[in-house]
Amino acid sequence: MNVLIDNRQTKVDASGLEALVVRAIKATLEEEEVVDEVEVSVSFVDNEEIRKLNKYYRGIDSSTDVLSFPLMEFEEIEEGEEDEKDAEEIYPIGDIVISLEKAKEQAEEYGHSFEREVAYLTVHSMLHLLGYDHETEEERKLMREKEEKVMERLGLRR
């Protein structure tokens, strides 16, 4: 597993978050039984930058907590024949963009730690990169169950 982290904001102290994000990504991959070597890029931004990204990519002119940018359908990795796979190959599965400013606001609003919020947003986004969504009630319920399992694995239950 290769995790690239880029802190592109200065409004919120990001000390210690890199290790937490790596743990959250690893726990999600383990829970989903992903055995392939994957690469994930994570960017920490402020509300203004995520608002611009949200407007550009989704047509929504407001800040949000996290955006997920899958680079491929995860099934593409799983479906390759074993003899065609390079054992050393690392599959870039996507990018995660987290507004630390929004995460801090939400942690205060929900009454839990900033670290728990960042871990949750990372897990949520990882599930999107792995092909999950929450467009329907059924999808939302499944995704929520998976999020809770990973958060429990991390010792960060509600």
UniProtKB/Swiss-Prot annotation:
Q: Which InterPro entries match?
A: MetalPrtase_cat_dom_sf_prd, YbeY, YbeY_CS
State where Zn(2+) binds. 124, 128, 134
Q: Name one Pfam family in it.
A: YbeY
For this record, an example GO cellular component is: cytoplasm
Q: Name one GO biological process term.
A: rRNA processing
Q: What compartments host this protein?
A: Cytoplasm
The protein's UniProt keywords, in alphabetical order, are:
Cytoplasm, Endonuclease, Hydrolase, Metal-binding, Nuclease, Ribosome biogenesis, rRNA processing, Zinc
Molecular function via GO: metalloendopeptidase activity; RNA endonuclease activity; zinc ion binding
The UniProt record lists the EC number as 3.1.-.-
Q: Which PROSITE patterns match?
A: UPF0054 (PS01306)
Give the protein's cofactors: Zn(2+)
The note on cofactor binding and number reads: Binds 1 zinc ion.
For this chain, the family text in UniProt reads:
Belongs to the endoribonuclease YbeY family.
Its biological purpose: Single strand-specific metallo-endoribonuclease involved in late-stage 70S ribosome quality control and in maturation of the 3' terminus of the 16S rRNA.
The name this protein carries in UniProt is Endoribonuclease YbeY
User: Species lineage, top-down?
Assistant: Bacteria, Bacillati, Bacillota, Clostridia, Thermoanaerobacterales
Name of the coding gene: ybeY
